[in-house]
């Protein structure tokens, strides 16, 4: 039976401008990625039932660092810099994108990717690039269509079906679900997927086994 992790115990570990400043590359990391207004921080706060675990901001693109959170020893969640921001100097934008790309390509402990998209504007070019990259390197993806409370039930189901249909083109392990931090919708499915991903890989050597 898959272990259920207590995400309420998640705590902040460190922020890093690039992978060279991250802790040792061991254990299991699940990363959260998305456009700068997709609701990443809100989703992490909802998942962990903590109001301010991840800083939320009215200003898109405030997540400028790779932020690591630990659920328990060797089990981590990662909040990646938002992409697709407009109100940012070009040089800084390139710096963030380089840090994001390095993490995705070189971090061995990365074992799953949650890509968050506003349900009203899903599958933008950068979103598709993010999913395609993960599929290319055999990393499973969970697409969360955030702010689902902004659409009526019928429109929500229609959008979900359209994105699921579009996801088939990636020909990889890509699951699509709706999510609302406000209504707590989709939280159980997110937790279940994280539990499954964390269970798929044995803990890092030296980590205490927990039943």
UniProtKB/Swiss-Prot annotation:
Its cofactor is Mg(2+). One of its GO terms (cellular component) is cytosol. GO terms for molecular function: GTP binding; metal ion binding. GTP binds at residues 34-41, 61-65, 79-82, 146-149, 179-181. One of its GO terms (biological process) is division septum assembly. It comes from the Bacteria. Residues 26-200 form the EngB-type G domain. Keywords: Cell cycle, Cell division, GTP-binding, Magnesium, Metal-binding, Nucleotide-binding, Septation. Belongs to the TRAFAC class TrmE-Era-EngA-EngB-Septin-like GTPase superfamily. EngB GTPase family. HAMAP family: GTPase_EngB. This is Probable GTP-binding protein EngB. The gene is engB.
């Amino acid at each position: 039976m898959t272990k259920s992790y207590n995400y309420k115990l998640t705590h902040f570990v460190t922020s890093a401008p690039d992978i060279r400043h991250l802790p040792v590359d061991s254990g299991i990391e699940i990363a959260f990625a998305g456009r700068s207004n997709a609701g990443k921080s809100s989703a992490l706060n909802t998942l962990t039932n903590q109001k301010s675990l991840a800083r939320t901001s009215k200003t898109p693109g405030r997540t400028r660092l790779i932020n690591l959170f630990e659920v328990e020893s060797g089990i981590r969640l990662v909040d990646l810099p938002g992409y697709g921001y407009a109100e940012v100097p070009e040089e800084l934008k390139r710096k963030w994108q380089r840090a994001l790309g390095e993490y995705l390509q070189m971090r061995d402990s990365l074992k799953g990717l949650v890509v968050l998209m506003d349900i009203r504007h899903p599958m933008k070019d950068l979103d598709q690039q993010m999913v395609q990259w993960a599929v290319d390197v055999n990393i499973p993806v969970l697409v969360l269509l955030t702010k689902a409370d902004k659409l009526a039930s019928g429109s929500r189901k229609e959008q979900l079906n359209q994105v699921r249909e579009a996801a088939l083109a990636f020909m990889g392990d890509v699951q699509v679900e709706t999510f609302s931090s406000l209504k707590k919708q989709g939280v159980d499915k997110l937790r279940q997927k994280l539990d499954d991903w964390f269970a798929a890989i044995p803990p890092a050597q030296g980590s205490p086994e927990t039943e």
